[in-house]
Curated annotation (Swiss-Prot):
Organism listed in the record: Borreliella burgdorferi (strain ATCC 35210 / DSM 4680 / CIP 102532 / B31)
Xref: NCBIfam families: PRK01130.1
One annotated GO molecular function: N-acylglucosamine-6-phosphate 2-epimerase activity
Top-level EC class as recorded in UniProt: isomerase
Cellular compartments per GO CC: cytosol
Record family assignment: Belongs to the NanE family.
UniProt keywords, alphabetically: Carbohydrate metabolism, Isomerase
BP term (GO), one: N-acetylneuraminate catabolic process
Protein name, UniProt field: Putative N-acetylmannosamine-6-phosphate 2-epimerase
Pfam families in UniProt: NanE (PF04131)
InterPro entries associated with the record: Aldolase_TIM (IPR013785), NanE (IPR007260), RibuloseP-bd_barrel (IPR011060)
Listed pathway(s): Amino-sugar metabolism; N-acetylneuraminate degradation; D-fructose 6-phosphate from N-acetylneuraminate: step 3/5
Reactions catalysed according to its record: an N-acyl-D-glucosamine 6-phosphate = an N-acyl-D-mannosamine 6-phosphate
Length: 232
């Protein structure tokens, strides 16, 4: 698939800011994407058609598009229904990422059926599975997702508090040894250059970094917390 070759090996920067964050602005996210490109990023992950359309005016990098939408207290919120798929396809994104965990979807549709429905309607659209476990990765691989991302590892009830770097990246090592046909993308809690480097050394070709690059409030907070640990 052409898109896989186009974004082969490198850093993808997630440029997102939610409504309650100071940098919530499609214009600001587009400039963040431009800065990421200048810094050497080979792709962008973005949330919402407004941000995506603005980012496309600034950079010509491949875009992983998502729409975060909460439905009736459902845990699944990353591109959860066909409505969000339609919006992203109409906007035009290289890859659509969606929650591919085993959790209940807001419309009651099973992941297998959801994937099949997407492929029937948009057969050429590249899809990325955001997973939180080995079993979910294997299932996504069998379904035929183009990419599998560790995005939700540490962010579900069963994995809460876990970190991709735990036990010398044991979860990542397990995925790499599972003979997945889909291209593996490491995403989630890669908050230092050394962690990203480690992923590539282990054999990963694509790593997504978000908050460590694009959320200055969080970055500032980490500095302040370390400073405040020093007793006067």
């Amino acid at each position: 698939m052409i898109i896989i070759v186009k974004i082969k090996r490198g850093l993808i920067v997630s440029c997102q800011a939610l409504e309650n964050e100071p940098l919530h602005s499609s214009f600001i996210m587009s400039k963040m994407a431009l800065a990421a490109k200048i810094g050497g990023a080979i792709g962008i992950r973005a949330n919402g058609v407004n941000d995506i359309s603005q980012i496309k005016l600034e950079v010509d990098l491949p875009i992983i598009g998502i729409i975060k939408k909460n439905y009736n207290n459902c845990d699944v919120f990353i591109t959860p229904t066909m409505k969000e798929i339609d919006e992203l396809c109409n906007e035009g994104v290289d890859i659509i990422a969606l929650d591919a965990t085993f959790r209940n979807r807001p419309d009651g549709v099973l992941l297998d059926d959801f994937f099949e429905n997407i492929k029937k309607k948009y057969p050429k659209q590249c899809l990325m599975a955001d997973i939180s476990s080995l079993d979910e990765a294997i299932n996504a691989d069998k379904l035929g997702f183009d990419f599998i991302g560790t995005t939700l590892y540490g962010y579900t009830k069963n994995t809460n508090g876990l970190n991709i770097a735990d036990n010398d990246f044991n979860f990542l090592r397990t995925l790499l040894n599972s003979n997945l046909k889909s291209t593996l993308i490491v995403e989630g809690k890669i908050d230092t250059p050394l962690k990203a480097q480690k992923c590539f050394e282990m054999g990963v070709d694509l790593v997504v970094v978000g908050g460590a690059i694009t959320r200055p409030a969080e970055i500032t907070k980490k500095f302040v917390e370390k400073i405040n640990q020093i007793k006067k």
